Amino acid sequence: MTVRKLEPLLDPRGYQERPVIKLAPRVTLDDLRKGKVLFYDNTKLSFCNYNQVFIRIKERLAELGITNFVDYVETVRGKDTAELEKYAAMLAKEKPTAAIVAFGDMGTSAATTIVAIALEKLGIPTVYMTAPPGSAITEGVCRVSRRKFVPLLRRRLPGQHGGRGTRAD
């Protein structure tokens, strides 16, 4: 068997700095009971009956004594990275204990991932909900942001069949 050496590829964008992202510290159930949970809908939950996802999550959290919620609905479309990070900073002013971000699909996954990463950078533990083909796009964005984030995206959410859910924790 002959081993063939592959030549390195030349990236026309040049060298790109890719800092390691440190995820926000995880919180306890007691922290969630005392604090506020941010629900961010990038407008995708308005399709079909997808809004039931947040309704059911809130019902389950209420069963655990977690009842302080704040909701935001805003599209990520048409915004660049700086605008998405600025929007995440605005969400962070609510001082949530944790955030749930949804919904990543083909058209919004990359931008919504940027919001989720920005929330993590601001110290807010964030769960990002997505499904194929959006989850593959999310993984790509996270790889660009840094590898440490990617393995955490491969866990299937409870009750999911077929598709891969992504978690940013």
Features from the language model and the residues they span:
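N-terminal amphipathic/basic leader segments beginning at the initiator methionine
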Residues: M1-R26
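Glycine-rich phosphate/diphosphate-binding loop of Rossmann-like nucleotide-binding domains
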Residues: D30, K34-N68
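Short glycine-rich or small-residue beta-strand-to-loop segments that form or flank ligand, phosphate
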Residues: K36-K44, V70-E74, A98-A102, V127, ...
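Short beta-strand elements in bilobed, periplasmic/extracellular small-molecule ligand-binding domains
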Residues: L61-T75, F149-R156
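Short, well-structured alpha-helical segments in soluble
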Residues: L84-T97, V115-A118
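Short, acidic/small-residue loops that bind anionic groups at enzyme active sites
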Residues: A111-I137, L153
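Glycine-rich, charge-decorated loop segments at or immediately adjacent to ligand/cofactor-binding or catalytic sites
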Residues: G134-R146
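A charged, well-structured terminal subsegment
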Residues: R154-D169
